[in-house]
């Protein structure tokens, strides 16, 4: 693969990741998960002010895109960031927008 082809593939991958993150509530959820891995959907619903169904839809989209992972703990499902690139992007955004 040529250098240009590799760069194009990387750009497409980065654009897909940013697109999956590019909703204010999804960014808020990811910020919460970066500081508190293993947070329940109920807690994320409370923090974001979204309805349970809206929170669930955002979590499902991010899980389908490979951004987050879920783990069952008794009756709760706990969410964590799965993709290290997401952690790096969230850390950069926090440095720029939350000094």
UniProtKB/Swiss-Prot annotation:
Keyword terms of this UniProt record: Activator, DNA-binding, Repressor, Stress response, Transcription, Transcription regulation
Domain named HTH arsR-type: residues: 7-99
Role description: Transcriptional regulator that regulates large-scale gene expression in response to sulfide. May act as a global regulator responsible for redox homeostasis. It functions as both a repressor and an activator. In the absence of sulfide compounds, it negatively regulates many anaerobic respiratory genes, including formate, fumarate, lactate, nitrate and nitrite reductase genes.
DNA-binding feature ranges: 41-64
Source superkingdom: Bacteria
Disruption phenotype: Disruption of the gene affects the expression of many anaerobic and ROS-scavenging genes. The mutant shows higher H(2)O(2) levels and increased antibiotic sensitivity. Loss of the gene induces drastic changes in gene expression profiles under oxygen-limiting and/or sulfide-enriched conditions.
Example of a GO MF term: DNA-binding transcription factor activity
SMART domains in UniProt: HTH_ARSR (SM00418)
SUPFAM superfamilies: Winged helix' DNA-binding domain (SSF46785)
Coiled coil segments of this chain: none
BP-aspect Gene Ontology terms: regulation of DNA-templated transcription
Short name of any one Pfam family annotated for the protein: HTH_5
Description of how activity is regulated: In the presence of H(2)S, two cysteine residues form an intramolecular tetrasulfide bond, which attenuates the binding of YgaV to DNA. Both unmodified YgaV and sulfide-modified YgaV can probably function as either a repressor or an activator. Binds heme, which may influence the DNA-binding affinity.
PANTHER family registered for this protein in UniProt: ARSENICAL RESISTANCE OPERON REPRESSOR ARSR-RELATED
The protein, known as: HTH-type transcriptional regulator YgaV
Induction remarks: Part of the ygaVP operon, which is repressed by YgaV. The operon can be induced by tributylin (TBT), a toxic chemical used as a biocide and in textiles and wood preservation.
